[in-house]
UniProtKB/Swiss-Prot annotation:
It catalyses: 5-amino-6-(D-ribitylamino)uracil + L-tyrosine + S-adenosyl-L-methionine = 5-amino-5-(4-hydroxybenzyl)-6-(D-ribitylimino)-5,6-dihydrouracil + 2-iminoacetate + 5'-deoxyadenosine + L-methionine + H(+). Its cofactor is [4Fe-4S] cluster. The lineage of its organism: Bacteria, Bacillati, Cyanobacteriota, Cyanophyceae, Gomontiellales. GO terms for molecular function: 4 iron, 4 sulfur cluster binding; 5-amino-6-(D-ribitylamino)uracil--L-tyrosine 4-hydroxyphenyl transferase activity; 7,8-didemethyl-8-hydroxy-5-deazariboflavin synthase activity; iron ion binding. Belongs to the radical SAM superfamily. CofH family. The gene is cofH. InterPro entries: Aldolase_TIM, CofH/MnqC-like_C, CofH_family, F420, FO_synthase_su2, rSAM. Its EC number is 2.5.1.147. Binds 1 [4Fe-4S] cluster. The cluster is coordinated with 3 cysteines and an exchangeable S-adenosyl-L-methionine. Catalyzes the radical-mediated synthesis of 5-amino-5-(4-hydroxybenzyl)-6-(D-ribitylimino)-5,6-dihydrouracil from 5-amino-6-(D-ribitylamino)uracil and L-tyrosine. This is 5-amino-6-(D-ribitylamino)uracil--L-tyrosine 4-hydroxyphenyl transferase. Keywords: 4Fe-4S, Iron, Iron-sulfur, Metal-binding, S-adenosyl-L-methionine, Transferase. Pathway: Cofactor biosynthesis; coenzyme F0 biosynthesis. Residues 59-306 form the Radical SAM core domain. It is an enzyme of class 2 (transferase).
Length: 381
């Protein structure tokens, strides 16, 4: 019997995908190892067709503002150029009035969402309690803007509050939800492989804790996004391991009939220009390699698309041109206007920190695809 050529294996695999089958992890790794231009073309075409089957041609965007309320942080992640010690030059901590003013400006500019995250500042307490401080952040925004969608606090921040105050994750998430947090960013995931985390973010929560906090949020009715920090030291096998964990967690939320689940997947390629030197040296470049990011984007659509239908590139990381190209590699959303974003821009990203609605619309229209403004949870506006 003739051994099938790589292209026959690839063709058969992609045909099965288009029939609605899920890839095995081994098949996902196989796709990430394809570098022949012809193979890349068929992988791209398959991801684009799947996107069309799963969510249609309309490309969505959200009008939002990022508020990074402090960069004072007790941790020292090897990819982070944002963090500062309290007494370091460049350290900042926004007051409640400043946060309210930024929110008001955003609403005037049509924002429907505030995305709020910050460093892990041990001094951020009210009456000696971390949770009280975070609830005051929520209350500051929600009292004045009760209908604004608040997308706030990563699993790492939830763990930090729980640790500081001796609470369970469920207690923290329930309190934040009841105060007005509408959804949580699935950041701090980086790569969900502890071997990688021990190098790039040894002080961060481990994989099991990230998964537990996200699953708890879903069970308590708080939707989350999912993310992956790619293109630093992780291997294709580890990238797929990460995607497999996300897929399994989404399947669990559906099987257990949890009231919430992942709303989207966002790929975040590593930007090292101003990041700490040791990881920069190890990675050996300062800006993402677009082709690597596009292949992983396509494979993420193929691997996750049956379970997480909305896929978004990061224009902050890739630039708007790179993110627009990702829309033909399996993505169906262009993300938010952001209005400001400190974490990636301080690492040296060249994508900018603010995009007008017109910028995003023009980028989408350049592909002859229709566009629609959406809510955080992917309802059309």
């Amino acid at each position: 019997m003739a051994v099938p050529t790589l292209s026959e294996t690839l063709t058969t695999l992609l045909h099965r995908v288009l029939q609605g089958e899920d890839l095995t992890p081994e098949e996902g790794v196989f796709l990430l190892q394809q570098w022949d231009p012809e193979a890349l073309t068929v992988i791209r075409q398959t991801s684009d067709r799947l996107r069309q089957q799963q969510v249609g041609d309309t490309v969505t965007y959200v009008v939002n503002r990022n508020i990074n309320f402090t960069n004072i942080c007790e941790q020292h992640c090897s990819f982070c150029a944002f963090r500062r010690d309290e007494d370091q030059p460049g350290a900042y901590w926004l007051g409640f009035d400043e946060i309210l003013a930024k929110t008001g400006e955003a609403v005037e500019r049509g924002a429907t969402e505030i995305c709020m995250q910050g460093g892990l500042h041990p001094g951020a307490k009210l009456q000696g309690h971390s949770l009280a401080y975070y609830l005051k952040l929520v209350e500051t925004i929600k009292t004045t803007f009760p209908t604004l969608h608040l997308h706030a606090f990563s699993p790492q921040e939830v763990q930090f509050i729980a640790r500081e105050d001796g609470l369970s994750y469920a207690q923290v998430i329930t309190a934040l939800r009841d105060a007005g947090v509408n959804s949580m960013p699935g950041t701090a995931a980086e790569v969900l492989v502890d071997e990688v985390r021990r190098v790039i973010c040894p002080e961060k929560i481990n994989t099991a804790t990230w998964l537990e906090i996200i699953s708890t949020a879903h069970a308590l009715g708080v939707p989350t996004t999912s993310t992956m920090l790619s293109g630093q030291i992780e291997t294709p096998q580890q990238q797929i391991e990460h995607l497999f964990l996300l897929r399994s967690l989404q399947q669990k939320a559906i099987q257990q009939d949890y009231p919430a689940r992942f709303t989207e997947f966002i790929l975040l390629p590593y930007v090292g220009q101003s990041a700490p030197k040791p990881l920069r040296k190890r990675v050996g470049r300062d800006q993402p390699v677009l082709q690597d990011a596009l292949l992983l984007t396509a494979v993420a659509r193929i691997f996750l698309g049956n379970w997480i239908v909305n896929h978004q590139p990061s224009w902050v990381k890739l630039g708007l041109a790179g993110a627009t190209e990702a829309l033909i590699w399996g993505c169906n959303d262009l993300g938010g206007t952001l209005m400001e974003e400190h974490i990636t821009s301080m690492a040296g990203a060249q994508g900018g920190t603010c995009r007008s609605v017109e910028n995003l619309q023009q980028a989408i229209a350049s592909l002859n695809r229709p566009y629609r403004e959406r809510t955080t949870l992917y309802g059309y506006l």
